[in-house]
């Protein structure tokens, strides 16, 4: 096995391209234990006998100036774009992007291309609701979590009728979806009934951007018996399927609805979350998987009390890397010290960006477009705060 590594400091320039060959070290230190003062350590592990090409970034959790954010493919509305393009859209106030990996699985379809399959919270905004897969989120104290999240989204009419709804997704033939301007220019729906919602007169009540674990009061501004309603600033649209028209026939302009974005567990104070799954490591032990376990390119996120671990395994390239099964991936993460780890979207989506360049070899020959990503940034210095400079 050939192991190569690079230590990264926030003050270092972007790494130079090394093609399929791992870059050579320039620092004489133990590759398995990065200096905590530097905060980051990248390793490229080549296991030639399989073969595997494994890219791992170890992040010191004591660095309070490091922070995770989620990105979207487009500046306005759902869609698809390459990871390197999403990095370019990171706002200056977040800080300097240091590393990024692809995020959640996403819906592939003309009208709803780029709809994340699971949960996404971006800067405290509930962009996409959870599904039946595991999610990763960071609570208000900075502690990471990963488990299934149950949506309890519900609207209630003035006469006491209640029903559940989804958020920013394709509406089914038996349900309701709440659309926000973050989704795009319009709802892309066909048929049914759509209620254009506006804030009530209370300017102090919660409104947009939509947040998790909150209660909202909304007034029906207009009722449309057509689909594809425009999504205007400071308005939401509640889209009802055709089968529900009779049930909610008494909803007219002026009606006031109660909306809840509750979840279990409660995510009301969460700033960053992203969907994925399945879980790979729990309590320091690899999760057990049954049935056929094929090898594919993989992306994963793990952690312990001291470090985060971002990992991408290349795959579907017989001369470089064949990919990993879930059990192989889980075992590898345990050996690296993870006590918790979650799988993210893989296959052609698996992409690893560090300090200005894509470090891995995506299986389609280049970056694939994706719906969202998880980005690590170094927060800007607080004006007047002592300057801390990483050693060269």
Annotate each predicted stretch with a short phrase.
Residues 10-392:
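Gly/Ser/Thr/Pro-rich low-complexity, intrinsically disordered segments
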Residues 1-10:
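Bacterial N-terminal signal peptides
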């Amino acid at each position: 096995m050939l192991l190569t590594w690079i230590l990264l400091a926030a003050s270092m320039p972007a790494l130079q391209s090394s093609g399929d060959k791992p870059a050579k070290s320039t620092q004489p230190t133990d590759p398995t234990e990065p200096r905590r003062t530097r905060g980051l350590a990248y390793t490229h592990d080549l296991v030639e006998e399989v073969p595997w090409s494994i890219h791992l970034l170890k992040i010191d959790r004591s660095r309070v100036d490091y922070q995770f954010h989620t990105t979207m493919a487009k500046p306005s509305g759902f869609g698809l774009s390459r990871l390197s393009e999403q990095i370019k859209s990171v706002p200056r106030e977040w800080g300097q992007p240091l590393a990024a990996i692809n995020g959640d699985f996403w819906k592939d379809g003309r009208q709803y291309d780029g709809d994340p399959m699971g949960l996404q919270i971006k800067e405290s905004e509930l962009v996409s609701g959870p599904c039946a897969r595991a999610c990763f989120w960071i609570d208000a104290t900075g502690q990471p979590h990963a488990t299934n999240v149950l949506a309890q989204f519900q609207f209630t009419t003035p006469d006491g009728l209640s029903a559940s709804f989804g958020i920013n997704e394709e509406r089914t033939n038996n349900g309701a979806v709440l659309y926000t301007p973050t989704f795009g220019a319009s709802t892309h729906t066909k048929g049914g009934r759509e209620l254009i919602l506006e804030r009530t007169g209370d300017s102090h009540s919660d409104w947009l951007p939509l947040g998790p674990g909150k209660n909202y009061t909304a007034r029906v501004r207009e009722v449309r018996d057509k689909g594809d309603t425009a999504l205007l600033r400071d308005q939401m649209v509640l889209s009802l399927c055709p089968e529900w028209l009779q049930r909610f026939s008494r909803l007219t302009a002026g009606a006031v609805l109660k909306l809840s974005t509750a979840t279990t567990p409660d995510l009301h104070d969460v700033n960053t979350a992203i969907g994925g799954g399945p879980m790979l490591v729990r309590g320091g032990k690899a999760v057990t998987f049954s049935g056929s376990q094929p090898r594919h390119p993989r992306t994963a996120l793990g952690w312990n009390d001291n470090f985060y671990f971002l990992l991408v395994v290349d795959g579907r390239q017989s001369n470089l890397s064949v990919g990993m099964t879930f059990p192989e991936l889980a075992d590898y993460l345990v050996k690296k010290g993870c006590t918790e780890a979650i799988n993210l979207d893989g296959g052609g989506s698996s992409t690893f960006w560090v300090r200005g360049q894509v470090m891995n070899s995506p299986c389609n020959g280049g970056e694939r477009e994706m719906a969202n990503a998880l980005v690590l940034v170094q927060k800007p210095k607080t004006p007047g705060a002592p300057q801390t400079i990483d050693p060269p």
